[in-house]
Amino acid sequence: MRASIILALLLSLVSMAVASSPTRAEEPRNATLFKDPQCSCCEEYADYLRANGFDVKVVNTHDLATINEQHGVPADLQGCHVTMIDGYVVGGHIPLKVIKRLLSEKPAITGITLPGMPNGSPGMYGKKTEPFQIYEIGKGPKRIYATE
């Protein structure tokens, strides 16, 4: 009888431990962000990605134009940094909603880009004054991927 009570207590403790253990969270996505060492808004964008579940590695470079060129980002569509996520190029201060769409749809493009440094975009100061035009990067003519 005493052994059965001890066994019941042990089973209860094991059940409680299993029930209270946290479920495994989704693994963070890796992102590599290339930026100019002097750019603070790019650090803000890296923090934005981290706060939204990305594991971000920041690479400082004085030759961002070459990195953009190597990844197929046309000169007129370049943002102030380039991020690689799951094999896609993500140029500039693109909102998370658009990145999630890209990663879920997995289109046959090189990536997406938000040219320049628009006010009110993630990581940028100021108020959003107009919709963000986010372009596809790939072969062919310039095409809008999303408007935010």
Predicted regions and their residues:
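Local sequence-structure signature of Cys/Sec-based thiol-disulfide redox active-site neighborhoods
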Residues: 26-47, 51-52
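Thiol/selenol-based redox catalytic cores and closely related redox-interacting motifs
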Residues: 70, 76-148
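Sec/Tat signal peptide C-region and signal peptidase I cleavage site
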Residues: 18-25
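N-terminal, post-signal-peptide region of Sec/Tat-exported proteins
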Residues: 43-92
